[in-house]
Amino acid sequence: MDKTALQLRPATVRDVPAIDRLITHYAQLGIMLFRSHADLYESLRELTIAEEAGQVVGICALEIVWADLAEVRSLAVDPGAHGRGIGRRLVEAVVVEARRLEVQRLL
């Protein structure tokens, strides 16, 4: 396996500093809301990570809202990795997860 190729995987506790860095970057631009580390740890199981060469280059969360409804949240891609389809791949991954969970509607 090529260790520099983009990999999608579930988030781990080691990812929280990188997740915080991405969210803080976009929160400072007024695009996302700031999140505390406590909130990030609480929602860690909802997050999918895009990793390349050992670096987190994107995040996306799937939050189950109700029995038939889920929401795509916290989609963020490192500015240096824009234009490469990373956000699209992250959304596709959470859509697959929503289907696996038999969620009928996705926002």
Spans of features found by a protein language model:
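Conserved GNAT acetyl-CoA-binding A-motif
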Residues: 97-107
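Conserved N-terminal entry element of GNAT/NAT acetyltransferase domains
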Residues: 1-13
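Short glycine-enriched loop/turn motifs at secondary-structure junctions
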Residues: 2-4, 41-42, 102
